[in-house]
């Protein structure tokens, strides 16, 4: 079951709030039901609300409704929204920004200034860039290692056989903290098998790095499968905020007017959306 909010066409603030509140309730119920089905405590699952392509006003409304974890996959948009919501820094539970998209090295310093968790670390060069950015910002930046579950280089992710070395690189990098793993289910493949493989890789990682406990997996269409496989973070976009209207781009797959996340040339990247049901990044 996927509950989708109506496309917001310049709705008044009160109407948009009501729409988001209803969608949030439906998604929260889905997560709770998925947790109950596999004997998990829903408070151990963080709902990341991915607000990409949506106005900062939506992010602000979600925060007012109790959402604390907000996801973005482009630095320019994420940095602008973080600045727009900077007045909430004094809130008892300020917004936590998750960077969930493919990250270029030249954007690492910017992301290191505002991100609470980077989900998409997949290569040593990015580790070095984020480390420099975190040190310059005077903060420690938690990072997840994005694992490739299908071997498609367009979608990002470190191959499974490179995970241990990349984990050691993050663990040894000043200014960074290894927090766990992230993955996106293969396009057209069974999500359950993919997420079970991710769970096995996460367990192997924890054996060497016991504090790396986070598993970011699952989006609007497969969150139940991800929760069953042990996801600690689910990245929810369209089920919370409604279908997105993307401008036509060369290489975008036919019919992909509302992908959870497509990058340049149709390469699918991470899509994330969030509210904590109790967990924290």
Identify the meaning behind each predicted range.
Residues 224-228, 236, 240-247, 265-268, ...:
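Expand to "…catalyze enediolate/carbanion chemistry for C-C bond making/breaking, isomerization
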Residues 2-221, 227-229, 241-246, 252, ...:
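Conserved alpha/beta-domain cores
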């Amino acid at each position: 079951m996927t509950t989708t909010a109506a496309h917001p066409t310049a709705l008044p603030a009160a109407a948009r709030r009501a729409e988001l509140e209803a969608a949030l309730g439906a998604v929260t119920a889905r997560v709770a039901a998925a947790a109950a089905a596999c004997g998990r405590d829903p408070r151990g699952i963080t709902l990341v609300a991915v607000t990409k392509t949506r106005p900062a006003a939506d992010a602000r409304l979600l925060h007012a409704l109790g959402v604390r974890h907000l996801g973005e996959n482009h630095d320019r948009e994420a940095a602008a929204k973080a600045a727009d919501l900077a007045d909430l820094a004094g809130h008892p539970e300020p917004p936590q920004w998750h960077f969930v998209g493919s990250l270029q090295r030249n954007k690492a310093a910017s992301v290191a200034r505002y991100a609470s968790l980077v989900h998409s670390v997949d290569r040593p060069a990015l580790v070095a860039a984020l480390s420099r950015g975190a040190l310059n910002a005077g903060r420690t930046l938690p990072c997840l290692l994005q694992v490739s579950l299908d071997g498609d280089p367009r979608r990002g992710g470190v191959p499974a056989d490179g995970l241990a070395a990349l984990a050691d690189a993050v663990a040894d990098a000043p200014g960074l903290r290894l927090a766990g793993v992230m993955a996106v289910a293969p396009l057209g493949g069974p999500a359950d098998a993919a997420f079970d493989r991710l769970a096995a890789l996460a367990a192997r990682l924890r054996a060497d790095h016991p504090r790396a406990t986070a598993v970011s997996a699952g989006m609007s269409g497969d969150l139940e499968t991800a929760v069953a496989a042990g996801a600690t973070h689910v990245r929810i976009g369209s089920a919370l905020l409604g279908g997105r209207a993307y401008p036509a781009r060369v290489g975008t797959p036919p019919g992909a007017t509302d992908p959870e996340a497509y990058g340049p040339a149709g390469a699918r990247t991470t899509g994330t959306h969030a509210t904590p049901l109790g967990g924290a990044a």
